[in-house]
Swiss-Prot record:
Cited function: Specifically methylates guanosine-37 in various tRNAs.
Chain's gene name: trmD
One GO term describing the cellular component: cytosol
Keyword NADP included in the entry's annotation: no
Organism: Mycoplasmoides gallisepticum (strain R(low / passage 15 / clone 2)) (Mycoplasma gallisepticum)
Name of the protein in question: tRNA (guanine-N(1)-)-methyltransferase
């Protein structure tokens, strides 16, 4: 899989790729990641990427030309199959991104282009040139770079040979459940003790205990997810 992030702050995005799981995935050649500053595709001598908004609204809006020029160029010249690419804006107006979407994208045979917005966002006509938009939540951040990195990270860690399969199967949101509570040494800290079953050595009992704790944890902390879990059992 190849994932390209289009941004005005390429150094910021690229710096994240030097750490942890993303770096391991790159070292293993499990994924190809590229970052492109779309300012270079602006037509004027000042490399202008934003302009005022029709109708008098406050702020500046990203111009269409640099983004569309960039998309056309990289789709033709930087991917193996131009017909197997999905392109998404990162926008609070997009489809809410969740673990199910991450799994679907990680298992797709399509490469990915993510466009990080800035200022007041995108000229509405950009939707004619992309497959959709993704939102990482109902809040506003300064730019789409952090959102793009969330999407990249969540996909890459699901790709083959990046993370141990057993670790993935027990993570939060698997089957709509949060992770079960976990403990480390010391056994007793100021009267708060580790549940004795976890020290029993009985793997079947431990698995059953952890499963029930995951259910209880989800019901208490995320009742919305718990309802999805219950519905999924039917």
């Amino acid at each position: 899989m190849k994932i390209v992030v289009l941004t005005l702050f390429d150094d910021f995005v690229r710096s994240y790729y030097d750490f942890s799981i993303i770096k391991n995935a790159l070292d293993k050649k499990a994924v190809e990641l590229e970052v492109i500053n779309f300012r270079q595709y602006a037509n004027d001598k000042h490399k202008t990427v934003d302009d005022t908004i029709y109708g008098g609204s406050a702020g500046m809006l990203l111009k269409l030309e640099p983004l569309v020029n960039c998309l056309r160029d990289i789709k033709q010249n930087q991917f193996k199959d131009p017909n197997k690419i999905r392109t998404y804006l990162l926008s609070p107006q997009g489809e809410v991104y969740d673990q199910n979407k991450a799994v679907a994208l990680s298992q797709s045979d399509h490469d990915l282009i993510l466009i990080a917005g800035r200022y007041e966002g995108f000229d509405e006509r950009i939707y004619h040139y992309v497959d959709g938009a993704l939102s990482v939540g109902d809040f506003v951040i300064t730019g789409g770079e952090l959102a793009a990195l969330i999407v990249v990270d969540s996909i890459v860690r699901l790709l083959p040979n990046v993370i141990n399969k057993d670790s993935l199967s027990s993570e939060s949101f698997n089957n709509y459940l949060l992770d079960y509570p976990m403990y480390t040494k010391p056994y007793d800290f100021e009267g708060y003790k580790v549940p004795d079953v976890l020290l029993s050595g009985n793997h079947q009992a431990i698995a059953a205990f952890n499963q029930q704790e995951a259910i209880n944890n989800t019901k208490m902390k995320r009742p919305d997810l718990y309802l999805k879990y219950k519905s999924n059992l039917k």
